[in-house]
Amino acid sequence: DEGCLPDWSSYKGHCYKVFKVEKTWADAEKFCKELVNGGHLMSVNSREEGEFISKLALEKMRIVLVWIGLSHFWRICPLRWTDGARLDYRALSDEPICFVAESFHNKWIQWTCNRKKSFVCKYRV
């Protein structure tokens, strides 16, 4: 897609790639940061962006749960995206730790950070 690396998909000035390999949340974030300059686990800033990535994960890769860049490791700190984006759009479940995006219903689900899941990297074009 325009401005993105090969095999990446573009949406509103950002590039995305779903990785089927499973990693812990921290390892997935490290992978995204090392893969491309400005890369992070994806932030989701609107319902439409969430639907876009759900389609990529579910329809193209047959993946239901993917790590996203939202975490609440210390619980005394506010929730934050790994890329520094503001948390203007929320689709939270009850008890935040790390989060996966669930592709069928476009919802975020708390998940144990040390479990291994597929993930989505995102960077600005």
Curated annotation (Swiss-Prot):
Give the stretches traversing the membrane: none
Q: In which tissues is it expressed?
A: Expressed by the venom gland.
Gene3D superfamilies tied to this protein: Mannose-Binding Protein A, subunit A (3.10.100.10)
Q: Which Pfam families match?
A: Lectin_C
Q: Which SMART domains match?
A: CLECT (SM00034)
InterPro entries the record matches: C-type_lectin-like, C-type_lectin-like/link_sf, C-type_lectin/snaclec_domain, CTDL_fold
* Listed GO MF terms: toxin activity
The principal location of this protein is: secreted
**Cellular compartments per GO CC:** extracellular region
Which compartment or compartments is the protein found in?
Secreted
Extract the SUPFAM superfamilies matched here: C-type lectin-like
S-S bonds:
C4-C15, C32-C121, C98-C113
Positions of the C-type lectin domain:
11-122
Write the record's keywords in alphabetical order, separated by commas: Disulfide bond, Hemostasis impairing toxin, Platelet aggregation activating toxin, Secreted, Toxin
Function text: Snaclec that binds to von Willebrand factor (VWF) and induces its interaction with GPIbalpha (GP1BA) (via the vWF A1 domain), resulting in platelet aggregation.
Its quaternary structure?
Heterodimer of subunits alpha and beta; disulfide-linked.
Family, similarity comment: Belongs to the snaclec family.
Q: What is this protein called?
A: Snaclec bitiscetin subunit beta
Q: Which species is listed as the source?
A: Bitis arietans
